[in-house]
């Protein structure tokens, strides 16, 4: 893996960090992230790296209401199952929510709601891969790496 370049910047939902290399965006982190990114100590602060700059601009545009989707090359690292779940998150339309059961059905594993939930919780690209749009079966907001107030704000 090549060196990841990153920037941390203020946003309407708090500080965000974006890390990318030439292959795509690898991580988006909230200041209060539950899980730290692997290898973060080796990242180089470079806010002018092309994909870091583009991701920052698109995220801020989205968070200010000027965008509903993203056009970024993504490079998440995970298990084959996690990657399938994360790709499926991109199918949840803006302004809609899915339950974990709906996400499991869309992944093709209708009995795997808990495994889908675990993969959702490890999403390295929140907001862009909209894990915040996944809610409990009864419509309640459930865990989110950026915190439930942030999840509510994103919805």
Feature locations, PLM:
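Short glycine/serine-rich loop segments
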Residues: 109-155
């Amino acid at each position: 893996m090549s060196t990841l370049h990153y920037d941390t910047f203020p946003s309407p939902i708090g500080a965000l960090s974006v890390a990318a290399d030439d292959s795509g965006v690898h991580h988006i982190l909230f200041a209060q992230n539950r899980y730290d990114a692997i290898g973060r100590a080796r990242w180089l602060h470079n806010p002018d790296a092309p994909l870091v700059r583009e991701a920052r601009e698109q995220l801020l545009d989205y968070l200010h209401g000027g965008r509903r989707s993203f056009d970024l090359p993504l490079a998440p690292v995970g298990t084959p199952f996690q990657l399938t779940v994360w790709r499926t998150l991109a199918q949840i339309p803006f302004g809609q929510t899915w339950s974990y059961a709906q996400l499991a059905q869309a992944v093709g594993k209708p009995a795997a709601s808990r495994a889908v939930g675990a993969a959702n919780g490890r999403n390295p690209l929140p907001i862009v891969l909209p894990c915040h749009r996944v809610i409990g079966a009864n419509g309640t907001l459930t865990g989110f790496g950026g915190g439930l107030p942030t999840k509510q704000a994103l919805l």
